[in-house]
């Protein structure tokens, strides 16, 4: 009865479940000895062949025997299909054993499925792998689970896999996984302290780089919006500040400013008076010094340097102005170009150490007094320069005539200080370092000069 039940089980495994049944798998599944499992498979094949239903079965055999190869005898064990069984037998000198290894419905192309079937069943029975085996050793004692090297390697591989999985987790919002999960895996003692310090340092550096990137983007956006706001002069100063923030474009902007300053303004109707050559040379020498000082200046002093350079550019513009002789309608305002007084009035402004006392035009005709001694108020056309930034980002200076009202006494006050405070030509050739210190000292000198002019004018009126 027992053998009949076993055969029914084998038939169910092969036909119904379409499994590959090996003698090892059958021994562990049914709990029988391996030799008994081999006999059960052999009987099942013989019974199916007698019933003429064995044509659907494919059988593999385990063959062992001695083989003479290269003049040496050796013992050979092979798993072969039924159609190659006779060929393997003929090669063996002595056949030791032949028994059924596996039964399956499909024909196998290689031994891969057989290996997988035995591997799975042996892995699930590692502690009792020799329980149903034909080879046993009474002196063999199994090791404890903690002492076996295979279990240690298995545990270490699990720990490494867990640590790699945690390391590969992506951080969310700049924060890593909770510290409680990593605490159990970090080594204790000094090594654990060093690892924790390194982790905190990396987090701090990541936090520091993010605000720096935000500051750079905000500065660039603010610099891009600055030139479009304010008046013409505010656009000019905003342009200079934006050039300092953009370090890569600093040299190019400086070259553009030099070119625009050196270009003389275009005259349409009136003749011009040429500036002295010494003044041009000094401006050309001072401009390369400014470019070098811009590159060497630190970031902390950019605001102060921008104010000073803005004043210096104003001085250069005042030096470069070409004053046109205004046309007056009245006969009293006629001006002669060949008179020496006009050349004195058209002389260049003082050096950048002391800025000019007044940006008003200096080519005004001498006052004309009536016979009765009364002053005459009149309107006259004055040539003024206007600066603005064009579409290409270059600074353009244009001169436009504007009408102003003035008296004869005011003209006298403006003419006399201009001729009295005429600077020597050698004073223009000063180093650019003195031009840096000029605006602060020049402010005090300007105030004193204005006070002196007002006092002298007061006495002259009386």
Swiss-Prot record:
Its main location: cytoplasm. It holds the Pfam family CDC27. It is found in: Cytoplasm; Nucleus. The modification Phosphoserine is found at residues 306, 403, 405, 409, 454. Residues 218-230, 416-427 have a biased composition (Low complexity). Residues 144-186, 200-230, 254-384, 403-462 are annotated as: Disordered. Ubiquitinated, but not targeted to the proteasome. Sumoylated. Sumoylation by SUMO3 may be predominant. Residues 330-344 have a biased composition (Acidic residues). Disruption phenotype: In a conditional knockdown, embryonic lethal when homozygous. Induction of the knockdown in adult animals results in a generalized accumulation of DNA damage and ultimately death of all mice within 15 weeks after the beginning of the treatment. Heterozygous animals are born at sub-Mendelian ratios, and, of those born, some are dwarfs, present hydrocephaly and have a reduced lifespan. In cells, Pold3 deficiency leads to replication stress and cell death. Keywords: Acetylation, Cytoplasm, DNA damage, DNA excision, DNA repair, DNA replication, Isopeptide bond, Nucleus, Phosphoprotein, Ubl conjugation. The modification N-acetylalanine is found at residue 2. GO terms for cellular component: cytoplasm; delta DNA polymerase complex. A motif (PIP-box) lies at residues 452-459. The PIP-box mediates the interaction with PCNA. Accessory component of both the DNA polymerase delta complex and the DNA polymerase zeta complex. As a component of the trimeric and tetrameric DNA polymerase delta complexes (Pol-delta3 and Pol-delta4, respectively), plays a role in high fidelity genome replication, including in lagging strand synthesis, and repair. Required for optimal Pol-delta activity. Stabilizes the Pol-delta complex and plays a major role in Pol-delta stimulation by PCNA. Pol-delta3 and Pol-delta4 are characterized by the absence or the presence of POLD4. They exhibit differences in catalytic activity. Component of both the DNA polymerase delta and DNA polymerase zeta complexes. The tetrameric DNA polymerase delta complex (Pol-delta4), which consists of POLD1/p125, POLD2/p50, POLD3/p66/p68 and POLD4/p12, with POLD1 bearing DNA polymerase and 3' to 5' proofreading exonuclease activities. Within this complex, directly interacts with POLD2. Following stress caused by DNA damaging agents or by replication stress, POLD4 is degraded and Pol-delta4 is converted into a trimeric form of the complex (Pol-delta3), which consists of POLD1, POLD2 and POLD3. This is DNA polymerase delta subunit 3. It comes from Mus musculus.
